[in-house]
């Protein structure tokens, strides 16, 4: 075991696979351009918020200033606890979302979702499409 710095903090091999994956990821982002990725995800986020706002059974938790809001949307449903809704969307509709407190339990105390199990979080990625969002909306409508 190394006893001197910096070897003391790096006694094992470097994670070459992760380093290579990070390099490939950064190369892809540069190739696509951060601006292009941002614009696309912003358009999808705005579309999702607009469509979700049409559903009376859904409550959205959004920032007051949505100018730079992209990719993450938290919601609750009047008929289901977050973990129930996430399970139904996954098992019955093949839609992946996350439920719970999302590593931020104090935020849920602040927004009033602490006792109901948190929220359902939708994460929009670059490879998502409006059809994916429409599938989510159709699933939520079917559950009303």
PLM regions: where:
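Pyridoxal 5′-phosphate
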Residues: 1-144
């Amino acid at each position: 075991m190394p006893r001197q710095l910096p070897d003391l903090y790096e006694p094992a091999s470097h994670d070459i696979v992760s380093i290579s994956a990070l390099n490939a990821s950064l190369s892809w982002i540069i190739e696509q351009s951060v601006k292009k990725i941002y614009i696309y995800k912003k358009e999808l986020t705005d579309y999702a918020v607009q469509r979700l706002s049409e559903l009376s059974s859904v409550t959205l938790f959004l920032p007051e200033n949505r100018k730079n809001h992209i990719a993450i949307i938290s919601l609750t449903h009047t008929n289901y606890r977050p973990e129930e809704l996430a399970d139904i969307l996954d098992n019955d509709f093949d839609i992946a979302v996350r439920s719970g407190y999302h590593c931020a339990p104090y935020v849920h105390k602040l927004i009033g979702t602490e006792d109901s199990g948190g929220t359902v979080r939708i994460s929009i990625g670059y490879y998502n499409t409006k059809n994916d969002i429409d599938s989510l909306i159709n699933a939520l409508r079917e559950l009303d």
